[in-house]
């Protein structure tokens, strides 16, 4: 059998299971209201939590950065591609989100995936043990595999199980690794307990705050600031393409850790640096995030979250108890979840269906992703469509059961 035959059979299997992903094409800027596939929709799919992706100040800064530095960086960070915009942004990030450390330093990456690969592969290796939450992001998992460290997975957010694993470990280097806000459930890791366990067992704690940076904590400084946590043994990863509205990611840690990443992190060394204009736009984003406008956007987002929590309980499906901008609604089967997504699409609402392997089998769900750009009218429209779709689904299941019993 040829490779193409193998791939075609694999795609057919995905179709049979309702698991093939399809890209939609956006014709306008990321916003609450967009033109997607040539139709106007209200989008509940993006991670643009503060609604900054189309913010005029960020757009202007991006254009200004391109005029000043050009369209591309021209090389890797170690071979001519590290611009003043990159260096300034790293200093700003360390000052903004590095309050957990006495000597913080930041390192900018092109993507969150690359930042997590760097942290895992450069800080752990043969002889080290990584203790990983069962629901950690795929980029962390891939980094662990590449690191060649021993990986022990503990049940999601189960600090008692983690403590038992740490007690039994004789590894010289120990890393506890966890998302902060889990991207498919919206819950928040028990960070205070994780920090305490790390300090008690001489371990380092690496956290991925992709969905918390910009949203959680005073001025949006992130999950560690929200919990008022400090420790010299923390490595903090954040992304800049979600709440910050631009692109890229960063690692903040003690200056020695960052210097080691510069020297040894392959996903930092062996790739072209992101365009300086991107870093210039992120600097503008940080000003908005930290200012009064950022506070107002976070307050509006918090109100939207509470309203959404209430409206999801009015459906016949199972909402997940989340207090973040990620609001999942578990339906169960792939086919039923796809049918619900299509029903919402018919109302001009884009709410993505999340299916295995992203989530466990039998827990396919709609993932409502909120943005400060949404209005309460948008939520009212969403509620009406969800109730209609869930009632129709329940009626369909009831009819099928009656037919089977006949």
UniProtKB/Swiss-Prot annotation:
Pfam family, one: Aminotran_1_2
Molecular function in Gene Ontology: 8-amino-7-oxononanoate synthase activity; pyridoxal phosphate binding
Keyword terms: Biotin biosynthesis, Pyridoxal phosphate, Transferase
Enzyme Commission number(s): 2.3.1.47
Region forming the signal peptide: none
Binding site for pyridoxal 5'-phosphate: 112-113, 183, 211, 239
Reaction catalyzed: 6-carboxyhexanoyl-[ACP] + L-alanine + H(+) = (8S)-8-amino-7-oxononanoate + holo-[ACP] + CO2
Protein name (Swiss-Prot/TrEMBL): 8-amino-7-oxononanoate synthase
Lineage, broadest ranks: Bacteria, Pseudomonadati, Pseudomonadota, Betaproteobacteria, Burkholderiales
Protein's gene: bioF
């Amino acid at each position: 059998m040829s490779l193409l035959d193998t791939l075609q059979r694999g795609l057919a299997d995905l179709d049979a299971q309702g698991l093939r992903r399809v890209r939609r094409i956006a014709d306008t800027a990321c916003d609450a209201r967009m033109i997607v596939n040539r139709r106007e929709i209200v989008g509940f799919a993006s991670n643009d939590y503060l609604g900054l992706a189309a913010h005029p100040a960020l757009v202007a800064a991006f254009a200004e950065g391109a005029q000043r530095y050009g369209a591309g960086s021209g090389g890797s960070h170690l071979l001519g591609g590290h611009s003043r915009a990159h260096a300034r942004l790293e200093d700003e990030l360390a000052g903004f989100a590095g309050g957990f450390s006495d000597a913080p330093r930041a390192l900018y990456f092109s993507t969150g995936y690359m930042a997590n690969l760097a942290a895992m592969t450069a800080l752990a290796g043969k002889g080290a043990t990584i203790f990983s939450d069962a629901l950690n992001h795929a980029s962390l998992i891939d980094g662990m595999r590449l690191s060649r460290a021993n990986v022990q997975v503990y049940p999601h957010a189960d600090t008692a199980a983690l403590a038992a694993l740490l007690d039994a470990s004789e590894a010289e280097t120990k890393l506890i690794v966890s998302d902060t806000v889990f991207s498919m459930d919206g819950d928040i890791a028990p960070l205070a307990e994780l920090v305490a366990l790390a300090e008690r067992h001489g371990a380092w704690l690496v956290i991925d705050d992709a969905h918390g940076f910009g949203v959680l904590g005073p001025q949006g400084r992130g999950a560690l600031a929200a919990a008022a946590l400090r420790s010299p043994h923390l490595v903090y990863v954040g992304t800049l393409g979600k709440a910050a509205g631009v692109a890229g990611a960063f690692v903040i840690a003690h200056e020695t850790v960052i210097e080691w990443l510069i020297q040894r992190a392959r996903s930092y060394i062996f790739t072209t640096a992101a365009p300086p204009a991107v870093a210039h736009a992120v600097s503008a984003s940080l000003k908005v995030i930290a200012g009064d406008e950022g506070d107002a956007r976070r307050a509006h987002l918090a109100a939207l979250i509470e309203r959404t929590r209430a409206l999801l309980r009015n459906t016949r499906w199972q909402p997940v108890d989340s207090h973040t901008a990620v609001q999942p609604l578990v339906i169960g089967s792939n086919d039923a979840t796809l049918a619900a997504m299509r029903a919402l699409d018919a109302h001009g609402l884009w709410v993505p269906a999340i299916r295995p392997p992203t989530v466990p089998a039998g827990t396919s769900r709609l993932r409502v992703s909120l943005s400060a750009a949404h209005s309460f009218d948008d939520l009212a429209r969403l509620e009406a469509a969800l109730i209609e779709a869930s009632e129709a689904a329940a009626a369909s299941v009831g009819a099928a059961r009656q037919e089977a019993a006949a």
